[in-house]
Amino acid sequence: MTVSKFVQIRRDLHRIPEIGFKEWKTQQYILDYIGTLSHEFVEVKTWKTGVIVKVNGKNPEKIIGYRADIDGLPITEETGYEFASIHEGMMHACGHDVHTTIGLGLLTKAVSERIDDDLVFLFQPAEEGPGGALPMLESEELKEWKPNIILGLHIAPEYAVGTIATKEGLLFANTSELYIDLKGKGGHAAYPHTANDMIVAASHLVTQLQSVISRNVNPLDSAVITIGKITGGTVQNIIAEKSRLEGTIRTLSVESMKRVKSRIESIVAGIEASFQCEVIIDYGAMYHQVYNHEELTREFMEFVHKQTDMNVITCTEAMTGEDFGYMLREIPGFMFWLGVNSEYGLHHAKLKPDEEVIEKAITFLSQYVKWKGNRK
């Protein structure tokens, strides 16, 4: 069956998922496609494994930005697609292939239907980690092309195709990775009194961490600590000398993130004293909350409702993490959910976005950009 140009682009990208700052094939694919759009008013830069494209407007007064994340996840794909990932153990399980395709489609429209204002497209690596938005924002490559307004999207499996969802103000949570290493003294299982058991210490720590949420965070201000991985020990009859916890912290407010981390550190100090061990905390990557500019978001929602065939709804905050929050901290703009009607959710090995969304998104975003970027 013949598919449209942009559906084929999405499938091409889906085959080559790459993890953060290793998106070399993806970068080259984007550059090759941009090369087919060559015009004297199009400028291209690379930044690490990302791509920055500027379409110079006819009579610019501002720069409008669109950000698309381009990286995949370390997940083994189970979609059954004919165009499934060719990279073992990697998959576009968060829809970044769709985000990138929509960006290339919007870029194509921008070249053929040039507007007054400048447009900058940020094809950003490493959203899934360690985080590409903040260093890209601070890069020399973007300094002269820094947008005055910026928008981004994320696919939403739970919403129907043709629906977008967003809200003014806080949309996504503050998030932080959490790694805790415990080191004690190993020994024979028959002589526990001669050792410091780090499996037991880690177990106590996991349960105590949950009290941070129930007893140290305002019930009206959501927060979550998830320990997703525990490792420790070697065999069944040796008391573990080491153990490791890996997880995430998510809070709706910056203040709660600070409070949660402070309490974690206090609890860890207690574990060290109780079990006579050494505990090291590493917070890893932290993503700033996604906070939509109220006026721009309201204006965008009204435009979509009145001038496009898309359905726009107001959603609630999500505990999702997104490094686009760093861009919105410095640049007025917004992010929205884009419905893709998938039975399986984000980060699932069977995620299958409905490809009908691609043309719809390119069309309505192009309408918005022309409305926003042309003199009235």
Curated annotation (Swiss-Prot):
Keywords: Amino-acid biosynthesis, Diaminopimelate biosynthesis, Hydrolase, Lysine biosynthesis. It comes from the Bacteria. One of its GO terms (biological process) is diaminopimelate biosynthetic process. InterPro entries: AcetylDAP_deacetylase, Amidohydrolase, Bact_exopeptidase_dim_dom, Peptidase_M20, Peptidase_M20_dimer. Pathway: Amino-acid biosynthesis; L-lysine biosynthesis via DAP pathway; LL-2,6-diaminopimelate from (S)-tetrahydrodipicolinate (acetylase route): step 3/3. The keyword Hydrolase applies. CDD domains: M20_Acy1_YkuR-like. It catalyses: N-acetyl-(2S,6S)-2,6-diaminopimelate + H2O = (2S,6S)-2,6-diaminopimelate + acetate. One of its GO terms (molecular function) is N-acetyldiaminopimelate deacetylase activity. The active site is at 69, 128 (proton acceptor). Disulfide bonds: none annotated. Its EC number is 3.5.1.47. Catalyzes the conversion of N-acetyl-diaminopimelate to diaminopimelate and acetate. Belongs to the peptidase M20A family. N-acetyldiaminopimelate deacetylase subfamily. PANTHER family: N-ACETYLDIAMINOPIMELATE DEACETYLASE, PEPTIDASE M20 FAMILY MEMBER. This is N-acetyldiaminopimelate deacetylase. The lineage of its organism: Bacteria, Bacillati, Bacillota, Bacilli, Bacillales.
